[in-house]
Amino acid sequence: MPKEFLTYQQQMEKLRRSGLAIEDEEACCGALADIGYFPVVNGYQSFFRDPSTRVYREGATFGDILALYEFDVELREIMLDALLKVEVKIRSAVAYEFCAAYGESQSKYLDARCYAASKGSKRVLPKLLNMLDYIANKDTSHEYLAYYRRAYKNVPLWVAVNAMTFGQISKMLTALRDNEKARIAKRFGVGNPKELSSFIRVLALYRNVCAHGERLFSHRCHVEIPDTALHAKLGIEKIGPDYACGKVDVFSAVIALRYLLRDDEFKAFKAKLVRCVNGYLSSDESIGEERLLEAMGFPAEWKKITRYKL
C-alpha cells in the first residue's frame, strides 16, 4: 500500500510522535524542504532509534540526525576528492601499459586475445568488450570520440578510457594479462597485482557511494581488500582469523588510498579526514567517538596510519 503524501508540518508531527524532539521548527522544515525526508531521516535515524521498538532514544533531536547527515556529506566530499585522484592515475596507467604492449589500434583492445585467459578475465570480458566497442564505434555523447573516428578512423585506448567509469576501468584491470598488471602494480609500489586489483575494486564501489550521495560512513562493501601490513601495524583486532575492521568498511578504502596515493596526497587527505571527524565529535556528542569509529570501521589508532612505511 503506497504511503500517503505528508506536508512538511505533517512530517514533523510524525517525527514527534516517534519520540524525536524538534528544537527549531523553522530549521527542521527548511532541511526537509531542501534535502528531503528520506535522505535525512530514513538515511540516518537508525543511529538514534531503539531497533526493537523503532522509537527514538530519550533526548534524541532532529538536530542530531541532521548533524550526522551533514558530517556524512563532508566525509563523502573528502573521500570523493581522493578517489578521483586514484581514478585518474589508474585510468592513465591502464591505457599506457596496454598501448605499450599492443599498440594504439582500437582493434587491439577490442580483441579478446589481448587479455588474460583467467577465470576472472573470462567473467568480465564479454561485457567489457561490448562496452569498449560502443565507446570506439557508437558513442555520440563525447565529441573527442567522434573527432578521432572522423580524423583517424581509430580511437586509441588513451582516448577511450576517458569515457569509461571507474568501475569499467576496474574490470579492464581485472582482464589484463599478468605482465601488464605487474607493471601497473609496480607504478603504485604494490608488489602483488591481485592486491592492486582488490584495492581498485573496493575504491570503485566507494566512488559510486560517494557520487550517488548514499550514506557513506557506515557503508560495507560486498568485496574486501586483502590483509595488509598496515592491518597488523595499526594493531587491528582479529576475530578468529579475520581482522575486525579495515576489510569492507570505510577504513578499507582509507587503507587502499594509503597505498595508491602519493605520500603528500595522502597526508593532505588524512588531515581533512581528521578535521572532519574531530569537528563532528566536538560539535555533537549524541553518538560519541567509540560508536562513530565502530560504524566507520576505524580502529582506535587510525590516525597513526601515516607513521608506518609501506
What is each PLM-predicted segment?
Residues 1-310:
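Long, contiguous internal "core" modules enriched in hydrophobic/ aromatic residues
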